[in-house]
Amino acid sequence: MATKGQTLVNTRSKQVIEFLTTSGDSNGNLLEMVSSWQPNAPEPSEHYHPFQKEYFKVYEGELTVKQNGETTIYRATEMFEIDKGIVHAVWNASGKTAKVYWKVKPALRTENMLEIRAKLSQKGMFVTKFFTRLLLPIKYRKELRTGKGSF
């Protein structure tokens, strides 16, 4: 279980996440993080959250966001939200580091899922196929699903 101040490193997504407020801190109501993406991070698989809404504020750099097939670039000081059920992908396609405030409501087990992804990436496991196609649909069905949104 994640703790306030804990940092995760996902070598595959080129992402570092620091937990500000965890599910345990908020009785499951929210998860708050600061996420930093290294330059030229790979585009992740599109997915959606059936029961969660995400909020982002770009502190530094820029993020590329694909929602329902449309791509938008958000820059420092800009904010955006992703409603539950919206198919999306978020990554740093730019040549500079991106730093973002990221909030997920409700938290559910998102922090645990992020911890597992980070551990798998550090072990050099092919996270995309193994994790998103086999483990995610079963263990984290309430948190994340791949494919088309249905909500």
Question: Which residue stretches match the model-derived regions?
Answer:
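Jelly-roll (double-stranded beta-helix
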Residues: 1-30, 41-52, 57, 62-151
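Short amphipathic
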Residues: 32-36
